[in-house]
Design a protein with these regions (language model features):
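Extracytoplasmic
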Residues: 16-50, 241-246
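Extracytoplasmic gate region of multi-pass secondary transporters
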Residues: 35-36, 220-275
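Helix-breaking motifs and short loop linkers at transmembrane-helix boundaries and internal kinks
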Residues: 47, 78, 99-104, 133, ...
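Central cavity-lining transmembrane alpha-helices of secondary-active solute carriers
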Residues: 57-72, 265-277
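Conserved MFS/SLC helix-loop-helix module at the cytosolic interface between two early adjacent transmembrane helices
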Residues: 66-101, 282-288
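Cytoplasmic helix-loop-helix junction between adjacent transmembrane helices
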Residues: 109-146
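Glycine-rich segments within core transmembrane alpha-helices of 12-TM secondary carriers
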Residues: 136-164, 179, 349-363
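Symmetry-related core transmembrane helices of the 12-TM Major Facilitator Superfamily/SLC fold
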Residues: 170-187, 378-395
Length: 419
C-alpha cells in the first residue's frame, strides 16, 4: 500500500481540502460524461441519424469555449467562489436535458452544461496545485483523477434506466441532481486557497506608483504554446482511441454490448492503479522521466491493441492503460505549475479548450479515414505518433518541476505573503 500513498504527510488542512475536492470531482465528471452515454438513446427517440449524432457531439465539444470567461473570473474573484458556483450550476443546467422536446434542445443544454463541468474540473486541479505541498502535487491530482472516474462511472451506472422505455434516458439526467448534495457541502466547507488570498492582499496594496509583479503577471506565452501543442497532440490520439473503441469492438470483433462493458471495465481498473503509483513516482523521482517513457509506450500499446484479437488485444489495452495512467499525474500537474497565480486558471482553460477542439478535429479525420476503409490499426498507430512527439517535446522543452515551489517556477509570485 505504501506505493499508493503520498511521498510526504499531508497537513490537516491539506487532507480536508483534498477530501472536498475529491467530492467536487464527482459532479464534474458526471456532467462531462452523461451526454456521451445517453446520446444514442436520445437520438433514437428523436429519429436522429448517426451523422446528426456526430455533428451534435462536435457542437457539445466545441462549447468548451464557454469555460474561458469562467476561468478569467476564477483568477479575478477567487477559486472558491467559482468552484461553488459551478458545483451548483453544472448539474442543474445539464439536468434540463431531461425536459428536452427535441434533440436540438438537448444539445443546447449540454453545450452549456458540459463546459460548466469542464470549468469545475479545471478549477479543482488549480486549487489542488496551489494547496498541496511541493512533494505531493502530482499525487493529489492522481487521487482526484480516481474521483473523476467514480463520477463518470455513476453516469455509466445509471445507464440501465435508459433501457426502461424509449424516453427513459431522461431519468439519467435527473440522477445528476443528486450531486447537488456535494454543492451544499462545498458551500459550507471549502476555504479559499492561501495563494489567492495572498494575491488579493497584493491587489489591495496596488497604487498608481506601486505595481506588484504578482498582480500584473502575464501568461508565459512560450509555456502556453508548448502546452497547447502537447495537449492537442495527446488528445487527438486519446479522444480517437476512446471514442472509436466501442465501434471497433462492436463492428470488427463482434462484441455484444455486455462484452464491450466488460472489456471497458477490465481494461480501465488497472489504469486507476497506474494513476496512484504514477502520482507518487512523479513527486518522488520527477515528472519528465516518467512522462517521456510512459506516454509514447502507452499510446503505441493501445494502438497495437487494434491490430490484435483474443487475449493479446486485452493484454495490450491493459498495459497501455496502465502506462497512460502512470503518465497522467505528471502531465496534468504541469498545466497549473508553470503559470503564475494571477493567470493559473485562464491558462489551464486555454490549454483545455485547445485540447478538446484539437481532439474533435482528430475524430473527424479518423472517421473519414475509417470510412475510406483504412484499418483501425493503421489509423490508431498513425495518431499514436502524436504522443511520441509529445515525449520529444517534454524531454527537450519542459522544465523539471518536482521538489520545486510554485514561486520558484513563477518568480513573479515570489513576493506573495502566503500564510
Amino acid at each position: 500500500m505504501r506505493g499508493f500513498m503520498a511521498s510526504e504527510p499531508l497537513t490537516l488542512r491539506q487532507r480536508n481540502v483534498l477530501r472536498l475536492l475529491w467530492l467536487a470531482c464527482l459532479p464534474a465528471s458526471f456532467v462531462n460524461t452523461v451526454f456521451t452515454q445517453t446520446a444514442t438513446y436520445a437520438a433514437a427517440e428523436f429519429n436522429v441519424s448517426e451523422r446528426g449524432q456526430g455533428f451534435a457531439a462536435a457542437i457539445v465539444r466545441w462549447g468548451v469555449v464557454i469555460a474561458l470567461p469562467f476561468a478569467f473570473s476564477a483568477d479575478r474573484f477567487g477559486r472558491r467562489k467559482m468552484i461553488v458556483a459551478m458545483s451548483w450550476l453544472a448539474p442543474i443546467v445539464v439536468s434540463l436535458g431531461a425536459l428536452s422536446p427535441s434533440f436540438g434542445f438537448l444539445v443546447a443544454t449540454q453545450t452549456i452544461g458540459r463546459p460548466l463541468g469542464i470549468s469545475l474540473s479545471i478549477f479543482i486541479v488549480v486549487f489542488a496545485t496551489e494547496e498541496m505541498g511541493t512533494n505531493t502535487r502530482a499525487w493529489a491530482l492522481s487521487v482526484l483523477a480516481v474521483g473523476s472516474g467514480v463520477g463518470a462511472g455513476s453516469a455509466v451506472g445509471a445507464l440501465p434506466l435508459a433501457g426502461i422505455s424509449d424516453t427513459s434516458w431522461r431519468y439519467v439526467y435527473i440522477v445528476g441532481l443528486l450531486w447537488l448534495v456535494v454543492a451544499v457541502v462545498l458551500t459550507r466547507s471549502l476555504p479559499e486557497t492561501k495563494r489567492f488570498i495572498a494575491l488579493q492582499h497584493q491587489q489591495h496594496e496596488e497604487t498608481p506608483s506601486h505595481h506588484s509583479a504578482a498582480v500584473s503577471a502575464h501568461i508565459h506565452r512560450d509555456r502556453l504554446w508548448l502546452q497547447i501543442a502537447v495537449a492537442v497532440l495527446t488528445n487527438i490520439f486519446i479522444a480517437t482511441a476512446s471514442v472509436f473503441q466501442i465501434r471497433y469492438l462492436k463492428d470488427v470483433r463482434d462484441y455484444s454490448a455486455s462484452l464491450v462493458a466488460v472489456f471497458t471495465t477490465i481494461t480501465a481498473i488497472p489504469a486507476s492503479f497506474g494513476l496512484m503509483i504514477g502520482g507518487r513516482i512523479a513527486d518522488q523521482r520527477g515528472r519528465k522521466n516518467l512522462a517521456i517513457v510512459t506516454i509514447p509506450l502507452g499510446a503505441v500499446l493501445i494502438a497495437t491493441s487494434y491490430g490484435f484479437a483474443s487475449y493479446m488485444m486485452w493484454l495490450t489495452a491493459i498495459l497501455g492503460g496502465i502506462c497512460l495512467g502512470l503518465a497522467y499525474p505528471a502531465m496534468a500537474v504541469f498545466r497549473s505549475e508553470l503559470f503564475p497565480t494571477a493567470k493559473r486558471n485562464i491558462a489551464s482553460a486555454i490549454i483545455t479548450t485547445a485540447s478538446l477542439i484539437g481532439g474533435s478535429i482528430g475524430l473527424i479525420g479518423a472517421g473519414l479515414l475509417l470510412d475510406h476503409d483504412v484499418s483501425y490499426a493503421t489509423v490508431m498507430m498513425g495518431f499514436a505518433m502524436g504522443p511520441v512527439l509529445v515525449a520529444v517535446l517534454v524531454f527537450t522543452k519542459y522544465p523539471e518541476t518536482a521538489h520545486r515551489k510554485l514561486e520558484e517556477l513563477n518568480p513573479e509570485d515570489s513576493l506573495l505573503q502566503i500564510l
